[in-house]
Amino acid sequence: MGDIQTAKPHVFLPRGSEHALTGVPAHLGPYTLRGSSTTSDVSYDNSLGTKGQTLADDVLAQCDGDVGQVSTWFSGIAPGRFTLFIDPGTFGAYHASCAATELHLAAFDGNNGDLVNMLNVAEVDEVFMAVQNAGWDCGASHGEGLSRVLAAERYPAQLDGFASGAAWLDTSDRPDWVSMTEPTDTDYVSIGCAALFINFLCHQLGYSLTAIVAAGAPTLAQVYTNLTAKTDAFVAFSTLLQRRFPLGTPSGLTTDNPFPIL
């Protein structure tokens, strides 16, 4: 499968793993190709045994529908085939670059196919961002936020340890990662702000995910302006959240979507 790559991979890390991988890990292998679908070739690490087979079957059963839905959100673009590897571990998921279609998905305990499918959506949608080339950057906070929102839309029950909204709500100052974009996909504070803001656009203001994706820009503030023609993105967002979650009080939020707030 090749040697360790020195370039920083693009990752989908569970909370508490914000220490980004410094290089793509050596592929464990050997792998068994379990099967191929219309969109994807799915293999599992042999060390996973029958659990790997079952997880691969779960992914094969869902990946075409998942890729099809992501394609709909991205207005029908097609990035080509995906090569999926299910690996032992709890690292989340990664690929070598935003455009890389070789995706590595963690098996976790080997018993939750929907979790692995959520990881797949989170990496697949980043490839679509790269192909779309409209401003969403999978290696930056706003692109990572979009990745998580889309993955949770497909598998809402699996967000769990990947929820990021509280990381931003529970800071002392709630920094403005709407007007600015942080050039990392591993800071749960900026990612949490981004995920909350995208859900604000969708579930508070009523814009479809397809419209939000199409409004891509280098900052979420510009996405908001593209959609609304207004320039008060962070003020409107932060003022609304302050009403529900007063600054300085633990939010208790366990999802990335507290909207609508009435």
Name the predicted role of every residue range.
Residues M1-G139, G143, L150, R154:
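Zn2+-dependent metallopeptidase catalytic core
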Residues K8, T219-L262:
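Beta/coil-rich, acidic/histidine-enriched accessory regions frequently appended to metallopeptidases
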Residues A56, V178-Y188, N199, V213, ...:
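Active-site rim elements
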Residues C63, A140-G143, S190-A194, L205, ...:
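Active-site-proximal structural scaffolding
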Residues D66, D137-Y188, G206:
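Post-HExxH zinc-binding segment in Zn-dependent metallohydrolases
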Residues E123-Q132, S147, S190-S208:
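Alpha-helical scaffold elements that line and support the substrate/ligand-binding pocket
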Residues V124, F128, L150, R154, ...:
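Generic structural signal for hydrophobic core residues of well-folded globular domains
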Residues R148, A211-A221:
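Acidic helix/loop microenvironments that form the catalytic cleft of cell-wall polysaccharide enzymes
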